[in-house]
């Protein structure tokens, strides 16, 4: 069946034809690519078209598709069993590896998704502080739990629905929204609710409104404010965890949070999430403490074995991070040269192996700047890239993910496609 035929059939049985909104390609006015198989840096769809893949499952596939370490781990796990509803040695090994890799955390609890991780972390922070309000930032996305789907990024920004219908006002009222990279907005918020704020949660590198890093002064200021007011500082590292560095953002950015949320890379492509923190905070979690959180498939042996295999490989092969940086820098420099050659002033942001080409001339610091992007132009660009066999995010507000499997040949083909696509996009406007 063709992608179009599959999508038409999917729309009969699945809301919008997809199980996560961005996959519908709606924001680029396209038909979804229905994936059939992946190999290394390449993905093949149901029509037999092959693409150089920069979606990479939205982040988990840091080693690329079908890496032998991942394949072998899946085979090994299936021989033992996929779910027991009991603790396993794998959970212990996984938790130990995560804790030892991340500065400032003593314990970690496994869950099934990034959404579960952030939702649970906030519950624990509220229980620990005995406070109810939280601060988040415009354009930061922390999953689809009610209290966090307020002025959010990712699909909420892509589809211009930053605050979803279906969330009661009494829940929204507990979420205070501040401006990313603007410490004064946080100071004003704390001054208004000095004894009510349990936690500040943020993406230390925002990756769900495109790549927008928090500046150093902003992060250090948040750390200081949280210390002064006994507020729990939570880093959402679902995307950045184990990607920007094996030791994640504390090593890369130099600020240590009180709690952290993981997902994506720690599962090696299987559904997984985790949240961790200092021992005094994590001891609030049941059965050690009174804050309840549970899950039938939390810490399931299949995800644990595969995640453990990927993290162990990364730990033992730190050259992966050198290759990722080299590849990403090569791609960044190539795109900058193209923009200069074509006299285009679009904004290109890169943080390690995460990249976004913003179709705006406005310097990007936060949510308001991102909203100046020409999404119609991005849609044209996306289609031209796809036609040349390059699969990038079907949304202006999502990142490109570079994997260890991407080769120089892949990058050169990508740069050729970027040049051709930009030329065609701008020719179409002048016609």
Task: State the predicted function of each range.
Residues 1-431:
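Conserved N-terminal phosphate-binding loop of PLP-dependent enzymes in the Aspartate aminotransferase
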